[in-house]
Amino acid sequence: MLISIHVGHEYSFDASLLNRERIFQLENKRDDGIWEANFARPQLERFIAASPYIEAAAITNNLVYSSVRFGISASEGPDARSYMEQVERITPGYTKVFGFELVAGDTDCLKRPEGTLIPESMARKLFGEENPIGKPVYLSEFAGAEGSIIYGLSFEPAYIVGGVFRDFPENTRVKNALYIPIMEKEMMENWHTGLYYCYLLMSTPESASVTTETYMADSRAFLKSFTIEDMRLRPLSDLYFGQPVRADAAPIGNKLRTNMLFFIAILIIGIALVNYINLSIALAPIRTKSITIQKVPRYGSIWSWSPWESRLSPSSSPCFSCYF
């Protein structure tokens, strides 16, 4: 049972995401021949603007998929109850690429520095049955501060809930985290610091290769000045069991191990089936004997009259003769 649950979890990773077949991760190959997933912010925006086949772009930064968690509370003060929650920074397009299903509010809150999206589970944890829209959430680590800088990125001490989305399944790369915005102009002047990752929702799966080929043909000389030799769009369906790339902390699975567990599960089922058949065959004589024993008493009750019949026959014959 545990094996089947684990195997099902692995094989269905990201399968619940809408438009999964049209989502791609943007990657680049450096002059050392190694593929990596991180980019400088202006490099990403330049690529996105160059293609008419991109329907939506999701940009995240180096906190995504990391173990960084903050204390989140719905009130201030020493008595405020905090919960350790994952915090992710995204652009508004992230919700379009991965198909966030909002149950309250909207995603426009991500256009404001203090706006935030939270999952239903977190909303219930922080606010119970109350409507969370418009209410503040506080990062307890920054209590009393006007703002903080972590890894060169700016954080507000409090955020206003602008939207609540339905929780994603656990076996997806999209986390049920507190999402705060990457602002439009953030680090747009820095072409060399690769803090950002990008997923693209393409118009069709086939347009991905056309997009990268066209971009490389037009920008190869420009990219070489940043030691970028090539670029590619890798399908979301190839990422979890695929070859990991440098500087990508997204979850990955081990397909060989999962396949082995799957075959072990099949083997266990096969052995159980063979054992059941062997046991049934071994019990067949016992069952037959049991059936015979159950039938014999009936026949015994019939034959038990035979002695009486033999005794009655001579004595009863005169009676029968007199009668006749």
Model-identified regions with their sequence ranges:
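Metal/cofactor- and membrane transport-associated sequence elements
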Residues: 205, 262, 272
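N-terminal membrane-entry
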Residues: 250-268
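A short glycine-centered flexible hinge/capping loop motif at secondary-structure junctions
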Residues: 1, 295-300, 318, 322
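Mid-to-C-terminal secondary-structure elements
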Residues: 63-76, 86-104, 116-253
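Membrane-proximal extracellular/periplasmic loop immediately following the first transmembrane helix
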Residues: 3-71, 80-82, 109, 186-188, ...
